[in-house]
Every structure is written in structure tokens, then in C-alpha cells.
Regions:
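Repeat-based scaffolding regions
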Residues: 1-189
Length: 189
């Protein structure tokens, strides 16, 4: 099959047979190499995106090689920076790999592409949590929670988190303001 593909690159029957053979034998790096060759043989944007996503999936699922999976997805974004499924997959990988700073920027990129206000608020809130819990950046977390509330003033998780941080830091005026905001959105019984 290799010889057939050397003589006729892109010959689909040989390519499919070789994919099956590599998968059956668990020759994942050979399969990735074949896909890499496919990338040099095409200029079609959608084919490149599809091939790079296949490569990323093999690196992640079969080889447990997050750095190479991440690189494949970053290559997709070089071709199509607005490809939302890839942005989300890359975010998932950044989280699995503990690349928190990279994830913050990617969430901002996803929010810009999303266009859905609830999603934007959710991503901003997740960034605030990452700053607080993973990066231990209290000041950054406070600023991020405040940005969430600027987007959605009645967002209960951000109100609670910001209130908690204000209490821990002894910022009583800010805490009073948070309690008032929470009371305004609380249902009356």
C-alpha cells in the first residue's frame, strides 16, 4: 500500500486500506505520518482541518501525547482561527494538561467567537475560577469576577465568589455591596 501511495499519492482505496492496517496493528505514529503526508498533498482548507483533527485525536486518545495533540489543534487555528470546535477541543486539552494561562486566553478567544451572552458569562466565570483556584491569583480573580458582574450583574455564582473573597480580604464596603446585590436578586417569599 505504501508503494501504491508513492506512485499515486492520494489514491483513496490504498489510503483507506493502509489506515485500516495501521489501526489494526496499532501503528499510530505511522498513521500520523501518513496524515502528515496528506497535509502536504492538499491545499483544501477543510481537508487540512479534518486531517489535523484526526492527528490530534490519535495523539490524545491512542498515544496520550497531549503536547503533540495540542500542536495539531494549534495548527488548525493557524489555518482557521475562527474554528469554534477546535477552540473548544484545544481548551479541553489545555485543561487536561494543566496549561491554565493558555486556557485563559483561549476562553477569551472562544467568548469572542461564541456570540452567546450566557456562554460569554460562563467562560468569564470559569476564567475567574482558574485565576483563584489554579493560579492562586486573588487580585486577578477579584478583577475577573468583577468583569463577570459587569456582563451579568445578577450572576449568583460570581456574586457569591466575590463576596467570599471580599470577606477573606476584609473589604467590608465591597462585601456590603455584594450582599445588597445578592438581596436584590433573591426571590421574595
Amino acid at each position: 500500500y505504501d508503494q501504491c501511495l508513492m506512485l499515486a499519492p492520494g489514491y483513496l482505496p490504498a489510503q483507506k486500506a493502509l489506515v485500516r492496517l495501521y489501526e489494526k496493528q496499532g501503528k499510530w505514529l505511522d498513521l500520523v505520518g501518513m496524515y502528515e503526508q496528506d497535509l502536504t498533498d492538499t491545499t483544501d482548507r477543510e481537508e487540512q482541518i479534518q486531517t489535523l483533527n484526526k492527528m490530534a485525536q490519535i495523539h490524545e486518545d491512542r498515544l496520550t501525547d497531549f503536547p503533540h495533540a495540542i500542536e495539531c489543534l494549534k495548527r488548525v487555528l493557524e489555518i482557521a482561527s475562527d474554528h469554534l470546535p477546535t477552540v473548544r477541543n484545544l481548551g479541553r486539552l489545555y485543561e487536561r494538561a494543566g496549561r491554565w494561562t493558555d486556557l485563559l486566553g483561549l476562553h477569551d478567544q472562544e467568548a469572542a467567537l461564541s456570540g452567546d451572552t450566557r456562554q460569554v458569562v460562563s467562560l468569564a466565570h470559569r476564567n475567574a475560577e482558574i485565576l483563584e483556584e489554579q493560579l492562586k491569583d486573588r487580585a486577578g480573580a477579584v478583577a475577573a469576577y468583577e468583569r463577570v458582574l459587569a456582563l451579568s450583574p445578577a450572576y449568583p455564582p460570581a456574586l457569591k465568589a466575590l463576596g467570599r473573597l471580599y470577606a477573606q480580604d476584609g473589604k467590608w464596603e465591597e462585601l456590603t455591596r455584594m450582599y445588597r446585590a445578592e438581596a436584590e436578586i433573591a426571590p421574595t417569599t
